[in-house]
Amino acid sequence: MLTDRLRLKKARKLLNKINKLGPKMQAMSDEKLQGQTAIFKKQLKEGKSLDDILPEAYATVREADKRILGMFPYDVQVLGAIVLHNGSIAEMKTGEGKTLVATMALYLNALEGKGAMLVTPNGYLASRDKKELAPVYEWLGLSVSLAFAEEKDSKKKITAKTKRKWYNSDIVYTTASSLAFDYLFNNLASSKENQYLRPFNYVIVDEVDEVLLDEAQTPFVVSSSPNVQSNLYHLADQFVRLLDPEVDYVFKKDDQLFWLTAHGIEKAEQFFKLDSLFSNESRSVYRHIILAMGAHLTMRRGHDYLVVKGEVVLLDEDSGRLKRGVQVSTGIHQAVEAKEKVELTKIQKTAASITFPALFALFNKVSGMSGTAKVNEEEFLQTYNLKVVTIPTRVPVIRKDYRPLIFLTTIDKLMTAVDDVVEMHKTGRPVLLVAGSVENSEIISELLLNIGIPHNVLNAYNAAYEAQIIKNAGQKNAVTIATNMAGRGTDIKLGPGVKELGGLAVIGTEMLPKRVELQLAGRAGRQGDPGSSQFLISLEDSFISSNNTPRQKKYYRKLMKKKSKGKDITLLSGPRIRFSLLMLRTRKEDLNELMRSQTNKMEIILSLQRKNFYTRRDKIMKTDDLQEDVDRIIDNALNLYLEKQDLSNKSDLKYFINQHVTYQQVNVPDNLKTKKAIKDFLKELAYKILDEKKHVLINKKQANDFYQQVIISSMDGNWIDQVDRIEKIKINAQQWGRSGRPQDLLHQEKAFEAYKDFLDKITLSTFDNLLLSKIFTNEKGQLVVVFN
């Protein structure tokens, strides 16, 4: 906190300057205030920095916000905007007006003409903020866009020209996932006319902890042609349904471990008609059995995934939201689809992928906003070099946060939660009851329906109505059951008479990560309103049972034994159990941080390769004369081929020519005995074939287009295999780590070897495609290249 005070001390000096400029801005006419933008741009061209013009620019936007929106940013909001400009994270509590804070930082950083973005976790927030704030930016002379198609336009084809217009706006609002996919597709474009992104400059990441921490390990993937799909998924699913849990397999629920018993193995061999389940020939069958068992035993519908319109969609463990477009890796997803009897999605090869940490590392300056970033301050600093600065609230927080109640069983916990809702509902006090999963939200809903308590349910099934449900959650008599997704987004404003009843009551019914708990508690008590939070947890909560130590499991079994003998054990208390659960949560959060750190280290390697590849690819697309590149490729390819093969035998050389140079018969001289002589002969032959192709080409530009198509096609085809290879290296890194050497070092070595091999493959396939491809022009006069 001392560091925060020092950082804010500097910011307060700037705030004083901004406040002193207030009367000057207030006295300006609309026309004069609007003219400030042109003045600032001129000052920047003359050598002033953004820091130099910050006080006057912020004072300008502040006054514009008042005139256009009727809202004048408070001092604490200006402090938040200063922190954002400095490339740090502003931690601001729920209801403190982060949306308005962004106007100042975005305006200032857009003045250089390089672009400024605000990226949100979901489309609703981006669309809402752009619609609300665009009038301010446009009034001040800046262009603003929403860089994705809204739901009503989602089926329309978006052209590169449209996207170019979006991303060339001074200020861009978009979602993190839209930006990730646009970046990947932009770098897979077949020509510069199909590209639309300019270099990334400045970004504010809204809900930065959700994007850079919770979603850090989820890669965004563009797929290419699918791998061959196995037909064993349905058969393995049928087999697993026949298994008897008493004799055919062992399932350790707490550890999520399972295996077939000797009886189960014998049953598998009979079912699949195998001599041995563990022979090399049966390896695929065994793998599919394990996948099917995992789908049935460890993947729970309503907890880990939902089936929406015939599609298996994963659920985010922390936010409770649907993770559309994301699959569990290595066949588990298809096994779940077989279990749910929906159409199997094809396992596809990855054409391109990127994670959020790698994406935002491409910006010159990154800042962020969140209500709960301080919990992970050290991780933000170490991983992203982002400082977290807590902005003081405008008025003190008076919410009452009660100590968690610990129950032995889930049923005791849920019945207490329902009783609490009933008591509060009698007074008319609104309640937000948070369930840990979709499954639990529906159980609680049924309990409330049975006793006649009207309520709304917010979970991944009806996320489309989130804004409306949350908007009404603070009204008198409102009871809202929600998953963790209620922790972010739209503010819950109190209705008439609710303050007098004690404000919104938040009741959590699961043990959650500390940051998620703070998010949910923060839904109550916004802007000095009264409110309360109370978390009810049980030793049967999935967060606890899946992370318990053997000692804690023994303690739980001991208590359950006593309860089964008639002893009344409902509430658990005392410092020992509280400390034990606190340590359990700390261990789990430390493990999550370690996993994110390892993923980020490995992703850095792919990021470097991706950046190098896209730079090379971009250069090829933007080069008007590729003859030198083609000359170099031919020379390097022949060197590589001659290093790998001995072509001194005439028949071997002829075979090589038919495979890599031309399908036509070629007279090969008898005197080619040295590598140099063979290389010179092959090089001369290669240029002769290229010259023959040029007769089909009308001019130098068309010849360059041919070179471009061949090189880009070779690069893209090999890049797909390279990404696939790096992913396999990443998966195997943990196993290699058992050798005693650091995982990240082993991963780095293997990835470097793979990249060197990848560059060689591009050279060789480009050589082959230059010479063996067929070219012609279609009826529109366009060049068509056919690769064999």
Curated annotation (Swiss-Prot):
Keywords: ATP-binding, Cell membrane, Cytoplasm, Membrane, Nucleotide-binding, Protein transport, Translocase, Translocation, Transport. It comes from the Bacteria. Its EC number is 7.4.2.8. ATP binds at residues 77, 95-99, 491. It is a peripheral membrane protein. One of its GO terms (molecular function) is ATP binding. It catalyses: ATP + H2O + cellular proteinSide 1 = ADP + phosphate + cellular proteinSide 2. It is found in: Cell membrane; Cytoplasm. GO terms for cellular component: cell envelope Sec protein transport complex; cytosol; plasma membrane. The keyword Protein transport applies. Its main location: membrane. Gene3D superfamilies: Helical scaffold and wing domains of SecA, P-loop containing nucleotide triphosphate hydrolases, SecA, preprotein cross-linking domain. GO terms for biological process: intracellular protein transmembrane transport; protein import; protein targeting; protein transport by the Sec complex. Part of the Sec protein translocase complex. Interacts with the SecYEG preprotein conducting channel. Has a central role in coupling the hydrolysis of ATP to the transfer of proteins into and across the cell membrane, serving as an ATP-driven molecular motor driving the stepwise translocation of polypeptide chains across the membrane. Belongs to the SecA family. PANTHER family: CHLOROPLAST PROTEIN-TRANSPORTING ATPASE, SECA INNER MEMBRANE COMPONENT OF SEC PROTEIN SECRETION SYSTEM. NCBIfam families: PRK09200.1, secA2. HAMAP family: SecA (MF_01382). Monomer and homodimer. Part of the essential Sec protein translocation apparatus which comprises SecA, SecYEG and auxiliary proteins SecDF. Other proteins may also be involved. This is Protein translocase subunit SecA 2.
